[in-house]
Amino acid sequence: MAVPKKRTSKTRTNRRRAQKKARAPQFVECPQCREKKLPHRICQSCGHYKGEEIIEV
């Protein structure tokens, strides 16, 4: 079995784990109704996406 030759330092471990932090979602404004929505998603309040009505709300 493979075994590490050197011990991984605390700093190196922490640097690697720093990439796994949770980030707050970024919201954008819907151009139709001005509500906050996630980017590249259908607006939940008006049902528009890329200027077209996808679902009737």
UniProtKB/Swiss-Prot annotation:
Provide the residue span(s) of the region labelled Disordered.
1-23
- Gene Ontology CC entries for this record: large ribosomal subunit
Q: Name one GO biological process term.
A: translation
Q: Does the keyword Ribonucleoprotein apply?
A: yes
For this protein, the record's Pfam families field holds:
Ribosomal_L32p
Keywords assigned by UniProt, alphabetized? Ribonucleoprotein, Ribosomal protein
**Which HAMAP family does the UniProt record give?**
Ribosomal_bL32
Check the record and name the PANTHER family matching this protein: 50S RIBOSOMAL PROTEIN L32, LARGE RIBOSOMAL SUBUNIT PROTEIN BL32
Record-linked NCBIfam families: rpmF_bact
Would you tell me the protein name for this molecule?
A: Large ribosomal subunit protein bL32
State the species of origin: Natranaerobius thermophilus (strain ATCC BAA-1301 / DSM 18059 / JW/NM-WN-LF)
